[in-house]
């Protein structure tokens, strides 16, 4: 194998974390910075009880989410008018350019998710949407849910 040949990379758990523009802490996984990825990133996210992200979208990049554990409310679409309740084991696909905002639906349990994006520089395509953060229907989530 030559010096320029692609090779596998291992990124050890606990390698580090960073504060995302979305207002949450991400645990570093696969990205351009950690593994030389060219077309994807893959991270672990833990949302504390009652925590939420800032309203945002990912310009030109798709996202896939697997909720490992917990319960989350996801607001999405134009004006964040669409809503789904997510449970551990659920998968979510988010097309590029779709506004979204996840909320941990539990007051006592964290929500943990694996997130993959078609952007190896994960934070570069994040576009914050502060005008959506204070929408009236977001101030009172549709019921709280405890995980068990």
Task: Label each residue range with its predicted role.
Residues 56-58, 100:
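Histidine-centered divalent metal-coordination motifs
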Residues 83, 87-88, 96-124:
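Ligand-binding loop in jelly-roll beta-barrel domains
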Residues 26, 42-46, 64, 83, ...:
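Conserved hydrophobic/aromatic beta-strand scaffold that supports enzyme active sites
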Residues 1-39, 54-55, 128-148:
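A short, N-terminal "cap"/entry segment at the start of jelly-roll beta-barrel domains
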Residues 52, 61-88:
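A short beta-strand-loop-beta hairpin characteristic of the jelly-roll/cupin
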């Amino acid at each position: 194998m030559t010096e320029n040949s692609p090779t596998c990379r291992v990124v050890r758990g606990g390698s580090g974390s960073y504060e995302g523009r979305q207002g949450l802490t991400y645990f570093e996984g696969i990205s351009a910075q950690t593994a030389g990825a060219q077309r994807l990133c893959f991270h672990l996210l833990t949302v504390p009880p009652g925590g939420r992200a800032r309203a945002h979208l990912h310009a030109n990049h798709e996202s896939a989410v697997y909720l490992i554990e917990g319960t989350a409310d996801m607001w999405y679409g134009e004006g964040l008018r669409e809503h789904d309740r997510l449970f551990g084991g659920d998968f979510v696909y988010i097309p590029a350019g779709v506004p979204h905002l996840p909320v941990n639906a539990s007051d006592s349990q964290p929500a943990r998710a694996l997130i993959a994006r078609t952007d190896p520089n994960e934070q570069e395509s994040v576009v914050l949407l502060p005008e959506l953060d204070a929408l009236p229907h977001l101030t009172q989530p549709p019921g709280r849910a405890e995980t068990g």
